[in-house]
């Protein structure tokens, strides 16, 4: 799998900077893991604030991101660099923090990556419903073959979950990192 040993989570200690008792959120966790793979950018840009049920949440992206201080594996103790980074990604996505589960729209990811993290203009999202089954499988494989994990979102009327597709076998079995510390 492309993410290799990167197995981050939404809860302690990734959520240290989030409102008390709330997880980082699956969209932010999936995005953060992919960014950790690339170790890009070295520095963010700008700042962002929004109103939430916890008051105004803000983050200044104009700081040097110390990727090497962010372990790939599940945190067993507090790591401010990882927690700060994950919170920044969550704020960039206007995360709706809640103790029962934090959420936002995955469609916000490309704009946030471009605006606060200097990602190129060709970063985009795609909807499975816009493709036939075979076209979709071919698209996902092309991205993976190019070394680009695919941030996926799936769900139904009871909610949704964002996760990362980071590999496949010759039998079309796909590997997913669920963002739950190794699952």
Report residues per predicted region:
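Active-site-adjacent structural segments surrounding the nucleophilic cysteine of cysteine proteases
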Residues: 1-102, 169
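Residue-identity detector for glutamine
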Residues: 10-11, 33, 77, 106-107, ...
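Stable alpha-helical elements in mature extracytoplasmic
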Residues: 22, 27-34, 105, 109-113, ...
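Catalytic cores of large soluble enzymes that bind and process phosphate-bearing ligands
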Residues: 101, 105, 132
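Active-site-adjacent substructure of cysteine-protease-like catalytic cores
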Residues: 111, 116-177
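Conserved catalytic-core surface of thiol
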Residues: 179-183
